[in-house]
C-alpha cells in the first residue's frame, strides 16, 4: 500500500512539474507574441523598408551581369553577398526583438534633449570623401561630422559621430580630445558586432553619448528615441537621423561622395574590389531610401548636396 501511495505522490509531483514547464513555455510564447505585436504596431515602416531594401538589393544583384567585366565580380561574389544580406536581416530582427528594451532605455536617456534643438537653422552633415577638401564652411551652419572629418583644418564641428572602432583606432584618441566642451561626441554600439564597436573606455574618455545601430541594412524611422539609428554601410546615416531630430530648415551634404575614390586626406579604400562595390551599392540604396523618407516625412526640410559626385542629381546640387 505504501509503495502504491508513493507512486501516486511521485506521479502528482511529476504532473506539477510538467504543468509548471507548460506554464513557462506558455509564458515565453506570450512574451514573444506580445513583442511581435508591439513591433507590428510600432515598426511597420521599418520592416517594410527592410523588405524593400533587400528586394532592391536582390534586383540589383540579378542585373549585375552587365557590370561584371568592369568590377570583376563573379557569380560566387554575388551569391555570397546575397547570403550575407539574408543573414544580416535575420540577425537584425533577432537583435531588435531581444534588445529592444536596452535600445529604448539608452536612446530615451540621450536624444530627447536634442529634439528641435536647431529648429529653423542650417546643418551641414560632413562625410570624409575627397570633395571635403573643396568645402568652404557655410557661415552660421551647425556642423555634424563623422569619423575623421574633424581633422579637416577648416572645420569646427559641433557634433561628431563615430561607430567603427577598427577604422577609427588611429585617430580615436585625437577625437576624444577634439574641441572638448564645444563638440558633443556620439560613439555607436553596433548590435551583433560588438567587436568593432567603440569601447566604453573611449566613450568615457570623450564624454560621448552612446547609441545603438544595426549591422548593414537598418532603415530610417521618425522615432530614434525608441529605435536604432539607420545604417546602410555608412555612419553618415546615423548623423542624418540625428540632424532630422533637431528640426533644421536645410541640411547640406558635404563630403558624401559615395564612390571608391578614397578620403579627403588622400588615404585610399583598401577593401577588396568586390566587397567595395557591394558596400557602395548598399550605400547608394541608403541614399535613395533617405530621399523617399525625407519626401514623405520631412518635406519642409531642404536637402542640398555640396560639390556632389555619387549623389549628383538626387537632391539639390550646389558647387563651391
Model feature map: region roles:
Residues 73-320:
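Metal-ion/cofactor- or nucleotide/acyl-coenzyme-handling active-site neighborhoods
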Residues 1-90:
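Boundary detector for helix-to-coil junctions that initiate low-complexity/charged tails
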